[in-house]
């Protein structure tokens, strides 16, 4: 039994080795590093414009200052487990063309290998790729690059890139929910289910 488990573990390590050898987990975007204190990036962020995130009180959003590569963007920082620490970085490239998107996608493919997921729509109005990693502390990290054609009211047109440490986001959510438990719901009388709800 031990030999079988050891063999399976060894086989999994061999399969994971090419992806791990290709590149380290990305942690920096637009000059900002995931997990760092946002206040240490006063030259890159507009700290005075920090705002709460709708439906996520465990996070706050701080705008990214435009530079020669990015026209806009933001970082999400924690409010509970690690207050002020950067958990997500999202930036919109100044060049919104499809050619630029293809060039960036090619560079990401050469650096990080094949994406783990396609992040687009079949009609081609939204195209994108997602890479998934595990950071040195075994927290999941994702990198998403997308191109949007036309004027989508939710995303806007152009090219965006987003780097997220899901472990940091989840730690913030769990901390906030532990400190702010949901009120207990009162059980009321159950109505007729008309036979379509299992009991």
Label the model's feature ranges.
Residues 73-77, 89-95:
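Short secondary-structure capping micro-motifs at structural edges
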Residues 82-90:
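Glycine-rich, often proline-containing surface loops adjacent to acidic residues and nearby aromatics
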């Amino acid at each position: 039994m031990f030999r079988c488990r050891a063999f399976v573990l060894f086989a999994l390590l061999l399969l994971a080795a090419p992806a791990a050898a290709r590149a380290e987990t990305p942690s920096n975007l637009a000059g900002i590093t995931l997990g760092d204190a946002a206040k240490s990036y006063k030259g890159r962020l507009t700290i005075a414009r920090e705002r709460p995130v709708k439906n996520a009180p465990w996070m706050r959003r701080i705008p990214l200052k435009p530079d020669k590569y990015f026209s806009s963007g933001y970082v999400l920082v924690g409010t509970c487990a690690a207050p002020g620490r950067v958990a997500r970085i999202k930036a919109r490239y100044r060049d919104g063309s499809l050619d630029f998107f293809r060039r960036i996608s090619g560079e990401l493919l050469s650096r990080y290998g094949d994406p783990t997921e396609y992040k687009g729509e079949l009609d081609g109005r939204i195209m994108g790729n997602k890479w998934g990693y595990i950071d040195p502390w075994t927290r999941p990290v994702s990198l998403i690059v997308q191109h949007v054609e036309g004027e989508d009211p939710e995303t806007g047109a152009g090219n965006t890139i987003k780097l997220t440490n899901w472990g940091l986001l989840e730690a913030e959510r769990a901390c906030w929910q532990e400190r702010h438990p949901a009120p207990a719901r009162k059980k009321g009388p159950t109505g007729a289910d008309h036979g379509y709800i299992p009991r």
